[in-house]
């Protein structure tokens, strides 16, 4: 519980800093922001490598995971769609209900409002002595698939937002090649897995993705550049490692410290919105951004409703696994409520 509170506090502190620092740093702020963004990507890569390391399945039983995968996909997609419907039919005036741009914008916004599973969930369940339970084993599989589906659902969103450009086909090919490599070489390579080694791999993953972007930008210009986010390459790198848990106080402190820094940097990455109006900047060119600014009380109300819709969507697994008691299925679904670092990373990538 202390760790969850720390994550939330650091996210809020980062958000506050994102509104204060632009005015304080003035012309130096773009350089500061670029440095902070680099650290954020490295931290995100570190987290995703560790998520991939937890992806431990018996490849001989791959058919039995098919149901789990589609349940996890629906568990990732249903909250997204519920929130999208709420954004369009509740937050927008009726004249925009049939507007294509409004739907595209709000499908994108709702993707980043919908939750993903949290790695801290496993620690919480283990602390409750549930590590040997059916719920723990099942939620471990669903949570990893939930994170993977969150990454894959970004692809149709990219197509929806920018159209069928050839660069997206390149990205899709790379995605499927990475997934194929991850499956074929699952838990194959004996690599060092101390925190500093994983941090080094994280820097390399970020460096490679940036190199692809810069080279494509050099040859094809900004419009033709290829963006490969660190989420999937880092996840696959974790998959191909032969998982070896290094248990020590120093390892736990380092991993927690990087997660804490990541949450602060996610908050820091938020754009300046205090003192801005709907007619300011790029907001005026979008349907959603051109709507009148709501009061803080109204915003808080909608946050509560969106949270309830998210959790309602996460109840999807309760309707499956009928061989288990309803109480177990409900506990499994409630366990998926938690918000994780992957979700924060997706918000940043937005």
Regions found by a protein language model. Give the residues of each.
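Membrane-interface alpha-helices at helix entry/exit sites of multi-pass transporters
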Residues: 70, 131-145, 152, 156, ...
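Helical membrane-embedded segments and adjacent short helical loop/helix-boundary regions
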Residues: 1-57, 63-79, 193-204, 223-233, ...
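Core mid-bundle transmembrane helix pairs that form the ion/substrate translocation pathway
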Residues: 148-151, 155-261
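Structural signature of hydrophobic alpha-helical transmembrane segments
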Residues: 32-48, 100-117, 164-177, 222-236, ...
